[in-house]
């Protein structure tokens, strides 16, 4: 590099230092993209640009990557560190032809032919000055801010106005050694590399910016011309005896109520506010498997995000995370209750579209909403909706509402060409702002209507809320799912969309359940959730710190060595760090006496802390049931444990949306881990190591309240085999209330009528209701449930059932 070049580049860097702020995707390219630092790197960029090179050089050193200005020297041959597909675009005339850049690829391949040990990593790098997708009717603005092929003058304005929104995206490296070995090194391979690179950069831009935005009025006009809405307008006019024009005006009102009005400028402003907000609220946000979602976008999938719903913060968190992960924030289905001024208009311009909680047989509204959703899919916008329909008040997943999933499936049946993929998202927080409100609502207080004052109230209480967790779960390809459920589904494409095939509703229910299962499969076992789970299982919700840390070490090892699914995540650090983190959040009480430190939960918030336990209880329910078999039931063989767990698992699966692929192998792996941790020994059979029985006992308590509910249900079924489903639900709920009053059970879900409804539906499906031939099975499961309970609790249930039914 000449002195002149050096001075020029330093001057350019100094200017960019004040004008440019760069965000790197992914955040740690060397680690996230598995780059080998021992192998040479050459960057591939779409367009030759001095400012782009300067922006790239400003960040490479931070990540241990070579500077784009430093040439690569191989056997005394100096090679440019950057290969560009296109030359600079002059103010007048055509840009430089592609031969120069083709020659660069050819030279690189030739070097691999000469040196069989050489393996250059080609790393595609995309730079974006702002992320405005543009509008379908852009004219003057597009001419001034043309982003893909700007002249130096246009680039100057882009840096001046959008320099604080510079994104640099690194993509997976291509091994030239592999290319040379597999495909050869002649010029035709270089041509192929160039073509593939062009496609890659085009797709990458669409992932980063999204499709062109429509003019809202033009979109409305197009939707009103659709056959389904025209038909619905005619029916509305006929049924309500109004004119076609009046019915059409109603449809326009519905469209205006529903449709988003996405504004990139608002998103840019909002992300600044959200960056401040997250830094104020949380010490960090942990993200897992964002790369798999980026790849789905890159491969042309229509993405539908289906997260769990913990808090109103969910809307903001997912959009924020996706924006900084190099993806476009989705269009979000928001409840109409959030369409209040001024938040509603802001949400709408951030990509929210609003949906009524019930369509109440309103065919015109249904047609308008369905056609709008189809249009989002057709134009390639990602979509997000909460399948639970509302926020969970207990921390467990709610039973899914199937309306949006049914509409998504219906859109696929109407002939979407691109693959449609549902991406389950687990959201977790060390602190949910509304959790105290949830407790009040569960205690009978009326739910407050959303308003601006609630938002101000929440912001006023900003504090240290610990960390947030965003885990992307196992994706579900809709076309593959439909082929699995109904191999002949493609034959329905040409039929009337109003006529649903017989398999449609059952398939929707299966899909909704799978979504919830995959959300739980991506759970984050955080410091707060694990500590809450352990302390709530202890007597008086308190443990010596050393005992708590031992139990945490056991659970951390179990969840890491016997993962619930490959998509779960576990708290980083050891048990001491976990406890320190929790104490720093002021969620637990630390007291000292002469014998040491005691960690406890304030009795006033014990019920509230059950919310966090319930986020991950499904991860520990099978290990807890195994421990209960060993401690309470004194089971001594693997086969007996498997038989008991298999009896209860269908109910656990329905209640907790579990999805263990091979239950028996999972049980074996847990028992092996308990043996490895020296809690259990195995010779002729399984035996408890007495010195560690307290750890097994504590583990067993996690499932105890669940087993109490099952004992109530199966004792009732054994006494009254022909009981009606509604009576079983009611009697179970009444007995649960009595048991709770006598034994101090305060967990909200213990009294949740909806939970007993879920269980009764599953019992009917399994054939346990009104089936005399199943009485042997019912009696066996009753005996198992009774045997796993403390004697006092068991006797209360037996006596209460006998008194209730006069035996």
From Swiss-Prot:
A motif (HXXXXD motif) lies at residues 308-313. This is Glycerol-3-phosphate acyltransferase. It is found in: Cell inner membrane. CDD domains: LPLAT_DHAPAT-like. It is a peripheral membrane protein. Pathway: Phospholipid metabolism; CDP-diacylglycerol biosynthesis; CDP-diacylglycerol from sn-glycerol 3-phosphate: step 1/3. InterPro entries: GPAT/DHAPAT, GPAT/DHAPAT_C, GPAT/DHAPAT_LPLAT, GPAT_PlsB, Plipid/glycerol_acylTrfase. The HXXXXD motif is essential for acyltransferase activity and may constitute the binding site for the phosphate moiety of the glycerol-3-phosphate. GO terms for cellular component: plasma membrane. Keywords: Acyltransferase, Cell inner membrane, Cell membrane, Lipid biosynthesis, Lipid metabolism, Membrane, Phospholipid biosynthesis, Phospholipid metabolism, Transferase.
